[in-house]
Amino acid sequence: MEFPKAVIKRPNYHFEYPHKRKYKRIGRGFSVGELEKAGLNINKARKLGIFVDIRRKSVHEENVETLKKFSEQLSNQKP
């Protein structure tokens, strides 16, 4: 089973045009707020092998949905 990856916005650079900032990149891990919305805590997520980035403050809904789907897959897989 493949572990989920967090998707975050690229940083804003002052020398770029605004239309180039809409791309997203793979982040270091999920934020604490995303974990709480998905019903997980930091310790449980780390035991499951999910990377946690405690420095991030943003909450992206697509990451919350990814975490919910992943936890459903784990609950269905375990006997």
Swiss-Prot record:
Swiss-Prot/TrEMBL keywords: Ribonucleoprotein, Ribosomal protein
What InterPro entries does the database record attribute to this sequence?
A: Ribosomal_eL13, Ribosomal_eL13_CS
One of the GO biological process terms: translation
GO cellular-component terms in the record?
A: ribonucleoprotein complex; ribosome
PROSITE patterns in the record, alphabetically? RIBOSOMAL_L13E (PS01104)
**One annotated GO molecular function:** structural constituent of ribosome
Q: Does the keyword Ribosomal protein apply?
A: yes
Any Pfam family from its record, for instance, is Ribosomal_L13e
Q: Does the keyword NAD apply?
A: no
Task: State the family it belongs to.
Answer: Belongs to the eukaryotic ribosomal protein eL13 family.
What name is this protein filed under?
A: Large ribosomal subunit protein eL13
Phylogenetic placement of the source organism = Archaea, Thermoproteota, Thermoprotei, Sulfolobales, Sulfolobaceae
